[in-house]
């Protein structure tokens, strides 16, 4: 979230950046009204408390005086009781006003950086570069779901029987390919890119989701555990970022770089009718996540290196892709700047997002109380957090299937994955 004082002192800037995202003036107008109400109520409470303090001293003096002076204290005592009752009422009102203000502040998105293009939808994202070439086929390439169903390696029908729509069962080759991709990604990120592998919980509490920005705004996208303050994770970003919630990190320990493989669970609210076939949009999917904690001075460079780490996965797999910079209308709530990597899918004749790499600046750190202590200084500062997919395993799997398909429906294994397919028993 943004700092309360910053919002108050930079209302025009905050409003302008919200407008860039396609938001109306309503949220910031509401903030101004509630904040002014809070300040006026607070001023009234302070005035009454000062009046009570002055009167209390006067009453104490009168009580030490003559009988006549003691009688003069009685109406003052009565008045102070009335003031005390009014202060209690105003304090209750102030607590409610503060709650209302906190809700508004939590609903204000991160400020997009200056170089983020202004636009309304993903159609206005900016293509920055492409890597590799689209594969050429002597036959009409099929979509992954056709390949999987024909080879009996992906079963959507039985998955629907077990769990409903937007689930899949991987079998045989597809299941092994999924595992090979996961191990390849983790090996690359830990052995070459310098990340520490972690295996976090797959259930998180509301405080964790609030810190990373999923709550309260995106509650409908989450799977909640009834009667528990627990939710299935929508991404490993949530538990991994919260490893250092309410902690102060020594500057010499930064940057901290984590990678984690987890299943992810999303309700896909608002996606009715979109990508109903295949593995592109599932309620449950696997992902390798990359998370960084760094200093403000380093976060810009760390975003570029994070993007490079994700890109190398596709480069080693020999998959054609492009990098796009998200426009303001497509930017995530907590992000200040995001690059998407979109892989080419010949069976669908389109690019599909396979990774989002984002810099959150201190937005998540403020919500989660994640700080660092600069070397030689007593006062701590907020860290900057970043994360990205390295990569979404299911989408990488379908990209390999579609790009490496043969005319007979078989799939050629990319060279870099062959060691993971060697039989050991």
UniProtKB/Swiss-Prot annotation:
Pathway: Aminoacyl-tRNA biosynthesis; selenocysteinyl-tRNA(Sec) biosynthesis; L-seryl-tRNA(Sec) from L-serine and tRNA(Sec): step 1/1. It catalyses: tRNA(Ser) + L-serine + ATP = L-seryl-tRNA(Ser) + AMP + diphosphate + H(+); tRNA(Sec) + L-serine + ATP = L-seryl-tRNA(Sec) + AMP + diphosphate + H(+). It is found in: Cytoplasm. Pfam families: Seryl_tRNA_N, tRNA-synt_2b. GO terms for cellular component: cytoplasm. ATP binds at residues 266-268, 353-356. L-serine binds at residues 235-237, 289, 389. Its EC number is 6.1.1.11. InterPro entries: aa-tRNA-synt_IIb, aa-tRNA-synth_II, aa-tRNA-synth_II/BPL/LPL, Ser-tRNA-ligase_type_1, Ser-tRNA-synth_1_N, SerRS_1_N_sf, SerRS_core, tRNA-bd_arm. It is an enzyme of class 6 (ligase). One of its GO terms (molecular function) is serine-tRNA ligase activity. One of its GO terms (biological process) is seryl-tRNA aminoacylation. Homodimer. The tRNA molecule binds across the dimer. Belongs to the class-II aminoacyl-tRNA synthetase family. Type-1 seryl-tRNA synthetase subfamily. Consists of two distinct domains, a catalytic core and a N-terminal extension that is involved in tRNA binding. Catalyzes the attachment of serine to tRNA(Ser). Is also able to aminoacylate tRNA(Sec) with serine, to form the misacylated tRNA L-seryl-tRNA(Sec), which will be further converted into selenocysteinyl-tRNA(Sec). This is Serine--tRNA ligase.
